[in-house]
Amino acid sequence: MPKLKTKSAVKKRFKLTASGKVIASQAGKKHFMRRRTKAQIRNLRGTTILCPQDRYNIKKYFLPYGIN
């Protein structure tokens, strides 16, 4: 049986930590930034850890070898 391929889009958007958590960048920073306050823009920097249900879905359906 051939190896399962990882979805390319998921490879670019998410990373797995050593403990099995999924890291993603904050959503909502592409456009419409003028209407946001400086604090809102600042809080969108960096990355966030996905909630357990989203983590499960990403690992199960898109990262075939990501489930520990």
UniProtKB/Swiss-Prot annotation:
GO molecular function annotation: structural constituent of ribosome
Keywords per UniProt:
Ribonucleoprotein, Ribosomal protein
Top-rank taxon, per record: Bacteria
Query: PROSITE patterns from the xrefs?
Result: RIBOSOMAL_L35
Pfam families reported in the protein's UniProt record: Ribosomal_L35p (PF01632)
Q: Which GO terms describe its cellular component?
A: cytosolic large ribosomal subunit
**What's a GO biological-process term for it?**
translation
Q: Which InterPro entries match?
A: Ribosomal_bL35, Ribosomal_bL35-like, Ribosomal_bL35_CS, Ribosomal_bL35_sf
NCBIfam families with a match to the protein in the record: rpmI_bact
Hey, which family's this protein in?
A: Belongs to the bacterial ribosomal protein bL35 family.
PANTHER family in UniProt: 54S RIBOSOMAL PROTEIN BL35M (PTHR33343), LARGE RIBOSOMAL SUBUNIT PROTEIN BL35M (PTHR33343:SF1)
UniProt protein name: Large ribosomal subunit protein bL35
Q: Which organism is it from?
A: Rickettsia conorii (strain ATCC VR-613 / Malish 7)
